[in-house]
């Protein structure tokens, strides 16, 4: 599930229980794939600024993936209280 841009970065919109990837994360995914594709097509060298942006984007993406994984574990192990009648 997802689209594979020229850069090879897989962009998907996933759902884990009631947690979903937000619009800003999808924009981050699009920006990353666009930067990688343009750099490859134009043969550009990575500048210090570009490396910093890519590092920040990678850290943000990894944080989102970990949050989704953690929330999925938390949802599975959370004991729900019984309703009283």
Curated annotation (Swiss-Prot):
It comes from the Viruses. InterPro entries: DUF5477. This is Protein 19.2.
């Amino acid at each position: 599930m997802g689209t594979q841009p020229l850069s090879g970065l897989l962009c998907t919109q996933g759902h884990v229980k009631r947690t979903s990837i937000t619009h800003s994360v999808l924009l981050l995914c699009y920006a990353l794939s666009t930067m990688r594709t343009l750099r490859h097509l134009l043969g550009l060298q990575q500048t210090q600024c570009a490396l910093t942006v890519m590092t920040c984007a990678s850290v943000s993406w990894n944080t989102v993936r970990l949050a989704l994984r953690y929330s999925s574990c938390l949802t599975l192990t959370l004991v729900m209280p019984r309703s009283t009648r």
